């Protein structure tokens, strides 16, 4: 008996991806996924992930620890996007990588079959171009931790040369420039505005036990607001932005702290973190005139919203809140008047059924009762009068306490419950909870 190779994949895998993790990813219904990162991309050669898997060269992880097997390359990432019915967003290596490498990557993904890279793609099993729309020119090139770090002045030239080469291959792609509030943004926006569609911003928040639950939660919306306000200022102060609508792509945002339980940087997330993420979603809605795209970072393990062991997987507390808001909360902002601390309240119309949805976050320790008044019991949406029909449901994410967390292989304790609201005039929300109220219309 001769055995060439033995597969360590579970027998129910789907094209190499774990079925249980794929099911959780599908539940999130994320509209776009960014790959391959992150600090990793500044030392990544996309050619390493092409061709037969068994012949791909393993490489030392250029940014973190361990070895990158290169089992997942462009083809596998695109297949994952197909399985999840989501859009791909590819970051090119603008650190140690060069202009030709980036342009070739665009051609490999989007070029016709008769182009050099298109022919190679066809040889590897994909004749039809993928037509990837979203591309970022590097990652966090403002930081000295980044492979290929250089001065702002030098990177301005590098960004423009990358953009010219990538657009020469495919003028329809949308380019996202590396951003960082301060002098970096001022230089990039002043000198590269004609060579970008969006500008990337990142932020991470730390543990604030000493400041209390509310302080911990409010870190996220305050950072979103800080960045959005900075860009409003740039529009006033930078002549190159006149007449342009270069909005923010917040393609990394999250909490990042705590012990590494799930492998390298594999942190645990608590209910208090989920409340902060919910508050962030409220703030993104309020700042949607400035923020075009927001990508929670990351997906599985590390600082992800899904936690997995070798045998089990589950939504972290942050995954539960992302799933809840994707399923129930609307996307068309509605003005909210009044204030009742400590509640954070936002409202949106759900375009699929014209329901009026409210997000109510209670980052406090006590139950809060508030009055809900929809003026006239109706609203206008897309030249139609929508009247409340009296059917109301409240979805509540909470747990035993603010430090509750979910563990793979165990019953989740941070989870969503659903109940009908009989009285929409007097609404009660429990302590340390994120709530989505859905008001039906006719």
Predicted features by range, described:
Residues 1-185, 189-198, 224-225, 229-251, ...:
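Non-catalytic accessory regions flanking glycosidase/transglycosidase catalytic cores in CAZymes
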Residues 203-219:
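Active-site His/acidic residue clusters
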């Amino acid at each position: 008996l001769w055995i060439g190779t033995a597969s360590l994949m579970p027998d129910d895998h789907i094209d190499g991806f774990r079925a249980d993790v794929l099911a959780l990813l599908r539940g999130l219904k994320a509209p776009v996924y960014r790959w391959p990162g992150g600090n990793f991309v500044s030392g990544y050669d996309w050619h390493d992930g092409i061709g037969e898997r068994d012949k791909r060269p393993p490489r030392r992880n250029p940014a973190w620890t361990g070895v990158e097997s290169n089992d997942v390359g462009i083809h596998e990432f695109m297949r994952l996007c197909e399985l999840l019915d989501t859009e791909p967003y590819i970051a090119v290596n603008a650190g140690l990588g060069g202009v030709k490498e980036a342009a070739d990557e665009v051609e490999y993904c989007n070029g016709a079959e008769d182009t050099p890279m298109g022919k190679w793609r066809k040889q590897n099993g994909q004749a039809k171009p993928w037509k990837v729309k979203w591309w970022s020119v590097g990652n966090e090139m403002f930081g000295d931790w980044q492979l290929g770090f250089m001065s702002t002045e030098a990177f301005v030239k590098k960004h423009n040369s990358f953009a010219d080469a990538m657009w020469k291959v495919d003028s329809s792609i949308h380019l996202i420039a590396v951003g960082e509030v301060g002098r970096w943004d001022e230089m990039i926006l002043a000198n590269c505005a004609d060579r970008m569609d969006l500008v990337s911003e990142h932020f991470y928040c730390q543990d604030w036990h000493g400041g209390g639950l509310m302080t911990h939660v409010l870190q996220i919306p305050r950072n979103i607001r800080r960045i959005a306000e900075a860009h409003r200022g740039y529009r006033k102060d930078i002549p190159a932005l006149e007449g342009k609508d270069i909005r923010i792509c917040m393609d990394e945002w999250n909490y990042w702290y705590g012990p590494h339980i799930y492998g390298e940087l594999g942190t645990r997330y608590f209910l208090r973190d989920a409340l902060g993420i919910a508050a962030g979603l409220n703030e993104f809605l309020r700042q949607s005139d400035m923020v075009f795209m927001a990508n929670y970072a990351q997906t599985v393990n590390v600082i992800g919203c899904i936690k997995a062991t070798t045998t089990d997987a589950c939504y972290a507390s942050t995954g539960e809140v992302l799933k809840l808001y994707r399923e129930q909360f609307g996307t068309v902002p509605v003005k909210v008047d009044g204030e009742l601390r400590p509640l954070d309240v936002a409202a949106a119309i759900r375009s699929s059924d014209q329901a009026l949805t409210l997000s109510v976050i209670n980052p406090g320790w006590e139950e809060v009762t508030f009055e809900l008044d929809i003026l006239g019991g109706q609203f206008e949406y897309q030249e139609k009068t929508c009247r409340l029909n009296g059917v109301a449901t409240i979805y509540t994410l909470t747990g035993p306490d603010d430090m509750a967390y979910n563990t793979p292989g165990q019953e989740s304790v941070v989870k969503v419950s659903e109940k009908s609201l009989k009285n929409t005039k007097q609404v009660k929300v429990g302590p340390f909870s994120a709530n989505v109220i859905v008001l039906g219309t006719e």
